[in-house]
C-alpha cells in the first residue's frame, strides 16, 4: 500500500488536502509505529521538495498533539461560548442529535436544520459525503462558495458556460506571458509561486492593490486602486483594439457581443484608465500589449471577485482572452479553478456527493444571510458546522457571536480541534485528521489526483466525517443505501470518474497521477457551454437575471467622510483559519497589524508602530500600524482568519466586515469594507 519499510521505520506517501492551489505530495516518516516526521515528497510534480512553512510546522505540531486534538464526543456543560464541556459516548451524542433532529422536523420542518461547511478538508469523501445525509433529511445548506468565490463562478458561467475548466498548468511551457490578477500564490500556493511561475521564460504580470511577494517577483506590477479592476480591463482592451491586437478571426468564429461592447471599449483610453485606477497610462499600455501578443495565460484570483461588483469585474476580465484569442491553444487560456476530476473524466464529477434521491428540497442560503438568520429562532433551529470555523471566517462577527449564543439553537460542531465556533456548540464531535483515513484528493490547479493514505489510527475516539454521518444515519434508522456506501467503493468510483488509469493500489505506491499524460489544451474545439455555444460577452441569461447584458466599464467610488477601504487577504502562515491554533504559527505571525501607505499615514497624522483603532458601524479593532507603500494610498491591509481566542480583543478583522452581497452569486464583498482610523494616545 505505498509503504516503504526498513526495520522499525516506514515511509508512507500521502497527499495534503488543504484549500490550496498546490495539492502537495507528502511523505510520512514513522519510527517504531509512531509518526516521527511529516515532510514534502520531492518526487511530486508540485511539491518538489519541502512542504510550505505553515504545513511543515502545523503537521508536525498541533496535528500530532493529543493535547490539542479533540478526542471524544462532548456535551456543553456551561454557558455558550464558555468552552465548558463534559465527555459523553458516541452512542449518547448520536442519540441526542438524532432525537433533536426528529423533534425539529416534527415541530418546525427539517429545513430549519442548517448545515454549513467549506474546505477544512478538500478530500473527496470527507469533503462531500456528509451532504448525502443532509439532503436525505431535507436540511438547508448554507452555500459554501458564498463565503469565498461564488461571484466569479456565476460571472464566468455567463461568459463561458463553465467556471471550473481553466488551463492545464503544464501548457505554460508554451506561454510568452502569464497574467495573475487578484491572486497571491506566494501565500495561497507557495509551490506554484516557487516552481511553476518561474520554470519557463514567460513574462509575469501581476495586478493587485498590494505589492505581494508574487507581485514583487513579477516583471510588471500594476498596483490597481481597490474596486477599479473592471475599469482597468476596459483600458487594457482599448489599447489592444487601438493597436490592432484583437483576434478578428477568433471573434468572428467564437465570440458573441463584441460589436455591442466596442463603443464602451473605445471610450476607455489609457489616460481615462489612469484616472480611474491610479496606474500610469504607459504601464497599462505595456501590460496590454504584452498580454495580447501572447500566447498568454490569465489567472483570475478568488480575491478579485470579493467586491460589490465582483461579478462584473470577472465579466470584464474575461473579455481579454476572448478578444485576443488567448484560449484553446498551447500556452494560452484562462483559469479560475479547475475541477480536476471533471476535466479528467471529460465532464463527470466526484462521486463523494450524490445528488439527492428526491427532487426539490429547500434552496441553499448565502453565507451573507447567516448573521441575520441566526438572530431569528423561527428561521434556524439547528446549526451543524463541519469542515469550517464560521465564527472566525464569516463577516459581521459580533452578530454571528450573538446568534450562536442563542440558548434554544441546537448547534453541532464536527472538527479536529476546539475552534472558536466549537466553543458555542451543544455537541462537539471529534473528527479524524487526514493522516488517519484513506481518501482521494484532487488539486484545483494542477490536474493531479492524489492518494490520501491512512498513516495512523484515529486519535482517541475521533472518526472520519463520512463515518460520523453513516452512524448518524443508522441512529435515525434510515434505509437509503447511499448513506452507507463504504470508502473503498467511493474511492474506486472516483478514480474511474477522474480518467486516471491507476488503481488505488498503484496510486498509493506512486502517491499521485495526472489525469492526462500530456498537457491538455482546454476549449481547443471552440465550443462553449453557453446557449449560443460561443463566448457570450453579451449575455441574454444575465439580462434575464436582472443584470446588465454587457460588462460595465465601472470603478467603485472612493470612500468619503474620512473612511478608508479595508482589504483582508490570506495570510502567509494560515490556510483560511486552519493552523491558527498552532503555538509556533502564532509566534511566527506575531501580533496582528494594519498596513497603510505613507501618504495615508501622513494625512491621518499617524506613524509606524502606533496603536490605532479601526472602527465602523459593526465594531472596532485595535491593531499596531505598519506604514508601507506595499498598499495603495487610501486603502488598508489586514490579513484574515486569526483565531479569536488567540487575539487580545477576542476578535479578528471580520468584526469590521459587512455581510454585503456581490452583484451576482450572493457572495462576499469583504474587500469593500470601509473603516475610520484613529490613533490611541
Model-derived regions, located:
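N-terminal export/assembly segments and adjacent metallocofactor-ligating motifs
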Residues: 1-245, 267, 280-281, 472, ...
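Extended redox/cofactor-interaction regions of prokaryotic respiratory oxidoreductases
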Residues: 128-197, 202-207, 214, 230-234, ...
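N-terminal leader/propeptide and maturation segments of large enzyme subunits in energy/redox metabolism
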Residues: 74-87, 92, 238, 242-281, ...
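Active-site phosphate/pyrophosphate-binding segments
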Residues: 236, 256-370
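Long, contiguous, secondary-structure-rich segments that constitute the structural scaffold
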Residues: 459, 464-513, 582-595, 599-681
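Conserved short loop/turn motifs at secondary-structure junctions
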Residues: 114-122, 276-279, 301-308, 388-391
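Short beta-alpha connecting loops at secondary-structure transitions
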Residues: 216-224, 447-459
